[in-house]
């Protein structure tokens, strides 16, 4: 996966690879949910309880500069947020659950495209994800470089960073060059705003 990254909502080959893997583990697989989303289900025992385990699998539009055997083969596209790792971990967990079958109920492996552009989850949900594949809870995770091997962090509520888009509109006011005090200079206001906002984190 790391060698063959695909951008958000372009993950056709990655989705095929994932579907083939979970089919080989014995899961019932549904593809094309919200375009490239995948749900793989496995029922064991007689319980009506079900859980979802979720991972994302899109890459970023960034050039990888590492010189490693598994370096991205695509110019300007790379798995630099670790979504290949997330999917690999979920595939490994899915394989383990299928081999051991040490649970009672249904496990659903949810593979989400387009996390980086915030398109994948809404697309899957709008396509009936939870109506077609009801679950009592969904568990997800994100890699965190710097943790020791085998460590996990848990918390209630939000954790790690998120991306939101918002806009600020600055409205200037023109004036005569001899009377600048009667105007509002949007360039000065915008420059001050950029510096003030950046000072929040630096």
Predicted regions and their residues:
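Histidine/acidic-residue-rich, glycine-tolerant segments that coordinate divalent metal ions
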Residues: 68-78, 85, 103-202
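Short, glycine/acidic-enriched loop or turn micro-motifs at the edges of active sites
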Residues: 59-61, 83, 145
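Acidic/His- and Gly-rich active-site-bordering loop/insert found
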Residues: 2-79, 88-103
